[in-house]
UniProtKB/Swiss-Prot annotation:
Taxonomic lineage: Eukaryota, Viridiplantae, Streptophyta, Embryophyta, Tracheophyta
Subunit structure: Interacts with IBH1.
Keywords: Gibberellin signaling pathway, Growth regulation, Nucleus, Transcription, Transcription regulation
Subcellular location: Nucleus
GO annotations of cellular component type: nucleus
GO MF entries: protein dimerization activity
Pfam families xref list: bHLH_ILI (PF23174)
Protein name: Transcription factor PRE5
Amino acid sequence: MSNRRSRQTSNASRISDDQMIDLVSKLRQFLPEIHERRRSDKVSASKVLQETCNYIRKLHREVDNLSDRLSQLLDSVDEDSPEAAVIRSLLM
């Protein structure tokens, strides 16, 4: 009985090929390197997923760098100044 139940759950959580194509197409729109290519250029789903992971890593690095810069800026201004309050709000 539990085997049957797990198969039903497994089938229910799977996405269809059409859903996968739609998701990959949506991801493609967010990737600058792939989005700039002509629509006629075929890009595999695995390439889109790989580029998505690379792009997310790049965005994480940019966020880290910006946080570091804001922290440095915060250290250079008066703690009670309006500028410091704005910087603190950006870091939160």
